[in-house]
């Protein structure tokens, strides 16, 4: 199994645990459940309908999975570029990053369902757009623009993941 396949399966397993915790069981949403020393409380956005919650949780599964793989491959590309300082000597790391950013953006875009609230959809579109812009900068070998564009991408990704956290279980001790 290649490195991307392993990472995807690991991310899917982690997201499945989160999804099961968020959607599973017949307990009330606000009821903390104790497993060993960990208490998990589901925190849901105020005023969201059940259909919106389910749609956003499903969307967030894809966001978490895609973002994890995207970050990993982008960071691998940047480490290699910083080491060799030349696109010609980078090997295939730039192509991996481009492919992962574009594929991740497309998978997230396709995961938006009609019940996803418009404010969440707007955040998704910003994340998808900044992912595609970052891929374009890498493909165009525009090193000077990478820092600015990657900061935008990071901000958009963090904003979307923070929104996802409003719909997913929150854990603590």
Question: Over which residues does each language-model region extend?
Answer:
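Extracellular/mature segments of secreted proteins
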Residues: 31-32, 52, 66-71, 171-173
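Bacterial signal peptide processing site
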Residues: 24-27
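Alpha-helical segments in soluble extracytoplasmic regions
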Residues: 58-114, 149-165, 169
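Extracellular mucin-like PTS domains
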Residues: 32-46
